[in-house]
């Protein structure tokens, strides 16, 4: 009797445990406590809702970044649709090793190691979406689609392509894998060019692929286009000239900037060496920098026109004054500064024409430090030009109170002052506009009447300096005769 009772007790315990385990399995499979024989209608409803939830998902809607055009509507940078390969690690994680072998052909196509793929699945096993390969080619996408694998699908993204090539790359800059501007104009105008992703509700098949768009929850917003002042044809010609002469003279680098002085538009801005914008491994080091705005230089003899402007704008000199450069050399701060030969007595215009260092030093030494500093400062050396170009450096023109006699003398021929090529061209643009300042811009100006102008330097004196500069290329003693062009 006691034995039978024990047997009955053990059977009861086993039965209760079995019922408990069965109930737990049912609950884990997605049933809830209302799904019993007394609530069949409610049970069917719940099962339908669960199935519906498993088929429904939300996906982001990507759209294109704004296009960059040159002044003649030539496309320089644009975004093209690409497919991004996605997997569902949460479902792949539960597959048997034998089933995972079906994914080996996929890994071969994209060049992914099997061990790394397993690590990804394990590490991100809670995630329902993982980007296995971003922005694959159409050819690669087609090969993958033919495999018809579960839990593998594509979403649409956009990839930046640069039609301007190397000649524009360190001016336009580039974006990262997420289409966010990292350098150049892509960074400067990122808030304008950037798109805003949308959201949609989709229905999936049993492979995890979107088969139907149920609802657009949030519309995507495409980035705005911009039109640059740059001219593609001139830019390419200029870049090729830079490349030719850097290679010819084994120079480290060269830069070119061309400004339409009446509007302030930058028509060309080229640097060599540059980089291929389609090869991401080249996007590092000095090649990616726009040296026209980032590289600090001593302007040298290009400062002499501004020195003579300062001289004529002061009470110390007149147009008729003569400067004696004999004997053709001078000691400044322990160094001997020379002219190519003893030019003797020179007018102020001839100091520019012959690019006389001795003449420039003698003029600078006779000026009051304050007068010299104020006149050079008129041309915005050391100022923020507010072009909006990312990475713009300002250079430095130290206050005259910090100058010693040596620095005062050397500024006359462009040493002891630091600037950029952009600032130097801005200063010459003011001269070319006869003393009027017009802000420089890399964007095309559609309405000329809207151009801001401010007279900051004497008009007649600016014209006088332009005349002196013309003699540099036209007169027989000019140091720039080879730059003289007919009909220009």
How would you name each of these model-derived features?
Residues 1-280, 370-380, 481, 485-487:
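Periplasmic/cell-envelope proteins involved in peptidoglycan metabolism and beta-lactam response
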Residues 75-77, 204-214, 256, 260-301, ...:
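Beta-lactam-recognizing serine transpeptidase/beta-lactamase-like catalytic domain environment
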